[in-house]
């Protein structure tokens, strides 16, 4: 069965001959940016067809009517040519053309030569490479409740012409209000100190830029903030004078603290050095005391078996050793009965008086003969040592003897007056 068709729809064989069908195919092959050129060709084609159909009417009447008709035709033709020629426009390299059709956005025209139907489309060129500026100024209250005079310039650039024109009614005014809001928000959280130290322009520039971007983001304005510059940023004169004394006192305080810190570090380092020195001396004294004690113990252990075998001889020897230490540092001079200046130790007296008894006791006991020789030899050495010391005392004065005594390390003794 044949398919039912509408009365005004051409058949399949006649579709290729239908001019309106061809026109629809042409429209489908062009993109949105090339519609304006298609409108131009369609209008020219319609004008030519109109003149062909009306040719008989214009040229078949009488002379006066024919002249009038030709004049009207010429005017209409000239007007159409003028309208067609006026539709050409050129977009600069740094611009984009926002094309609207009866007030509605149609497309963006790229840089170059274009054509638009007059009275149907409108083109608004938008510069997207030039950096624009907005100035704002005012007196703003800080966090510490002080007023600050601010004069600031914000540089921005348009990145989306469509959003810039159609997102908000007045993008410049909206951006100005956003800048004021961001500036007041940052300054209201800042203390007066950073303004007095001229540090606000360095610290708050990035914060203000971020706040402006956050404010304008929901509006989709198609704007990017490039830079922020503070032309003037100062405190009122009355506020500045009131804070000069305060900041001078703060600087004096910091200087005093630094000096105190330096002095404290010096004292700590000196105390640390002294403590370390005392510890080293204490360790050396401890070691010396231990070694002396070990020497005494060793000496005692060496004498102990001799003392057990011969208590009397050992007692006399120990007594001699003790008296040697005592009288080797005495300043008393002992002479003989003739008052000759002959120095000798008290040990000599004891030895002369007891020499015979000692020899007899040693000869009676062969067991202790070797021990006696050892004791006698050591005793003789001690006698020679004492005599040499006494001779040194006689040759030098008391002060030199005190100096010599100060170098002795075996024991500590305080001299008598």
Swiss-Prot record:
This is Protein HflK. InterPro entries: Band7/mec-2_domain, Band_7, Band_7/SPFH_dom_sf, HflK. Keywords: Membrane, Transmembrane, Transmembrane helix. Belongs to the band 7/mec-2 family. HflK subfamily. It is a single-pass membrane protein. Residues 12-24 have a biased composition (Basic and acidic residues). One of its GO terms (cellular component) is membrane. HflC and HflK may interact to form a multimeric complex. Its main location: membrane. Residues 1-24 are annotated as: Disordered. It comes from Buchnera aphidicola subsp. Baizongia pistaciae (strain Bp). The lineage of its organism: Bacteria, Pseudomonadati, Pseudomonadota, Gammaproteobacteria, Enterobacterales. Pfam families: Band_7. The gene is hflK. HflC and HflK could encode or regulate a protease. The chain crosses the membrane at residues 71-91. It is found in: Membrane.
